[in-house]
Regions:
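Small-residue-centered hinge/linker elements
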Residues: 1-103, 112-179
Length: 179
């Protein structure tokens, strides 16, 4: 279900682009262009709208096109998979570090660049955000419900066998641990 939603959301948001769409903003020199790569919606690395593969392909196209002088990464994302975000960030770092490419990547944050959205902006040469952009919070969240008190009240004693101390750390039947 989540996979189907991610696919739908990313298709609606325009993920899955594998080539540039050319838009003329100002008439003038045609040998100097700026590539715009969208990071819109959930950052994910699976399915037909694989954002990681698409962004890597667009960076490769930008690196080979001599008319492209810079890349703008247009971000409007709440984040997504940590591995996908890291892979995109790593691709940007490699693009920026390659002396043969020598083109800046600039992040432009839209309404939201949170978590993985902020993560992919971090290696960019410059980052621009609107004063109302929701941004920040690189990290991972893990949630669980806890039924320990309820189990005590109804007199049920769960038994769990594990091969290590933390194997069942998110079990809803264990007492909550305060870090």
């Amino acid at each position: 279900m989540l996979s189907a939603f991610n696919k739908f959301a990313n298709q609606m948001a325009g993920a899955g682009k594998t080539q540039f769409t050319e838009v003329t903003i100002r008439n003038g020199e045609t040998d100097k262009r700026i590539a715009v790569i969208d990071v819109t919606g959930l950052i994910t690395s699976y399915g037909p709208s694989d954002m990681v593969a698409n962004i890597k392909k667009q960076l490769k196209l930008a690196s080979k096109d001599q008319r492209v002088k810079a890349v703008i990464l247009r971000i409007d994302s709440p984040g997504g998979e940590v591995m996908a975000s890291d892979e995109i960030a790593r691709s940007i770092r490699e693009f920026e570090a390659d002396p043969d490419i020598n083109k800046p990547v600039i992040a432009s944050m839209g309404g939201m660049a949170a978590s993985g959205g902020y993560y992919v902006a971090a290696p960019c040469r410059d980052i621009f955000a609107n004063e109302l952009t929701i941004t920040g919070s690189i990290g991972v969240i893990m949630q669980s419900v806890n039924f320990h008190g309820l189990m005590d009240k109804v007199g049920v004693k769960p038994v769990t066998y594990t091969s290590g101390k933390n194997k069942d750390m998110l079990s809803p039947f264990n007492p909550p641990e305060v870090p």
